[in-house]
Amino acid sequence: MSQGKIVQIIGAVVDVEFPRDMIPRVYDALKLDENGLTLEVQQLLGDGVVRTIAMGSSDGLKRGMTVSNTGSPITVPVGKGTLGRIVDVLGTPVDEAGPIDTDKSRAIHQAAPKFDELSSTTELLETGIKVIDLLCPFAKGGKVGLFGGAGVGKTVNMMELINNIAKAHSGLSVFSGVGERTREGNDFYHEMKDSNVLDKVAMVYGQMNEPPGNRLRVALTGLTMAEYFRDEKDENGKGRDVLFFVDNIYRYTLAGTEVSALLGRMPSAVGYQPTLAEEMGRLQERITSTQTGSITSIQAVYVPADDLTDPSPATTFAHLDATVVLSRDIASLGIYPAVDPLDSTSRQLDPMVLGQEHYDVARGVQSTLQKYKELRDIIAILGMDELSDEDKLAVMRARKIQRFLSQPFHVAEVFTGSPGKYVALRDTIAGFKAILNGEYDHLPEQAFYMVGSIEEAVEKAKTLN
């Protein structure tokens, strides 16, 4: 176990000098003898000096302090013992419930599965959220991004998905909180505890107040735990189907940006790190399904200034199977979830995967909404009266569809007072098909707002009259 000394400290970046014949490797974990702080080697600068990122606060460090090389990358506990527990980036429990009961550990840096180990699937994952199931269906073992600016409901949508999928799904879930609010992490823990599914969830938190080193690596810690569940074979030689939630992928990029300049790299577009695509790829390529088991991942992606062409969300887009775009314009109409039905996409939206009926209804809904979007300027200038009868009918149905895409959430019950609704896929398809066919042209559009199935809209219409 070689020892070195700190020679320079700039924020989260610490330079350590080792004897020439005992230089640590890139990604090795170093430990400070005095306070146990972990450093991760990023670069070898020559002359025995290595540049590292601190996995914790660098307050109180000084030159000349002794550092020991552990000889291996950061390793975290994995396996059943992590379920129901909250750990930090180093796998240390932070929930005051004693040490983690497992003898297995894994390095957080792993190679992505090889091409011949991958498995593709077209099995759908029902979420119970109408707009998602209809227009951007999720695949089991796929990657989904929830894109949105500040305050349009990414975390609430993710919590509802966790509520609907993780509780109904008998498998295991891993939740990685990357640079988000501590309050949300706390709420999530209590939500899981109250629903009695805590024993199926492992939680890894590196929140907003953590140094950039923690936020840069906490997604990898969570992913390492999820990979272990996927790869660990049972007596039948099969792994598990794991759900992996990340909130928020943008903060992972941002942490990389914060340390990139300190590591001496020239910034690229909009000040991001030049290694943005590589860092994103290294994380995303590991989130995949193999022939042993699957990882279905749902990632919240913050969109800076609502600009989807910003390098960070744009880089993330390339890796996803389905994108759920949350729109401020739709949120301002009071329609929640504020999913943009024309901007959200899914690779599964294909008649070969969904079946002809689902595909036709989804495309019918999109074309009706697209027509309404095109007519909106005419309506704003000339009013509804100038439209042809056919266009008036299309607008009327589009407004009903728009409202029917809203839905009360279980996780928002405490704020809204209206009970959450889970809508089965067949009910969703039947409801929208009936609206498109004009079966509910006689109902007022308010009847379709914030209801679950179409039967509820009919009941609501009776109370309105």
Curated annotation (Swiss-Prot):
Pfam families from the UniProt entry: ATP-synt_ab, ATP-synt_ab_N, ATP-synt_VA_C
Its EC number(s): 7.1.2.2
Recorded GO MF terms: ATP binding; ATP hydrolysis activity; proton-transporting ATP synthase activity, rotational mechanism
Alphabetical list of CDD domains matching this protein: ATP-synt_F1_beta_C, ATP-synt_F1_beta_N, F1-ATPase_beta_CD
Positions contributing to ATP binding: G148, G149, A150, G151, V152, G153, K154, T155
Record keywords, A-Z: ATP synthesis, ATP-binding, Cell inner membrane, Cell membrane, CF(1), Hydrogen ion transport, Ion transport, Membrane, Nucleotide-binding, Translocase, Transport
PROSITE patterns per UniProt: ATPASE_ALPHA_BETA (PS00152)
Topology of this chain in the membrane: Peripheral membrane protein
Reactions listed under catalytic activity: ATP + H2O + 4 H(+)(in) = ADP + phosphate + 5 H(+)(out)
Domain of life from the UniProt record: Bacteria
Main location: membrane
Compartments where located: Cell inner membrane
Cellular component aspect of the GO annotation: plasma membrane; proton-transporting ATP synthase complex
Class of the enzyme per the UniProt entry, highest EC level: translocase
InterPro entries (alphabetical): AAA+_ATPase, ATP-synt_VA_C, ATP_synth_F1_bsu, ATPase_a/bsu_AS, ATPase_alpha/beta_chains, ATPase_F1/V1/A1_a/bsu_N, ATPase_F1/V1/A1_a/bsu_N_sf, ATPase_F1/V1/A1_a/bsu_nucl-bd
Family matches, as NCBIfam families: atpD
Family: Belongs to the ATPase alpha/beta chains family.
Quaternary state and interactors: F-type ATPases have 2 components, CF(1) - the catalytic core - and CF(0) - the membrane proton channel. CF(1) has five subunits: alpha(3), beta(3), gamma(1), delta(1), epsilon(1). CF(0) has three main subunits: a(1), b(2) and c(9-12). The alpha and beta chains form an alternating ring which encloses part of the gamma chain. CF(1) is attached to CF(0) by a central stalk formed by the gamma and epsilon chains, while a peripheral stalk is formed by the delta and b chains.
Free-text function comment from the UniProt entry: Produces ATP from ADP in the presence of a proton gradient across the membrane. The catalytic sites are hosted primarily by the beta subunits.
Name the record gives this protein: ATP synthase subunit beta
Organism annotation: Neisseria gonorrhoeae (strain ATCC 700825 / FA 1090)
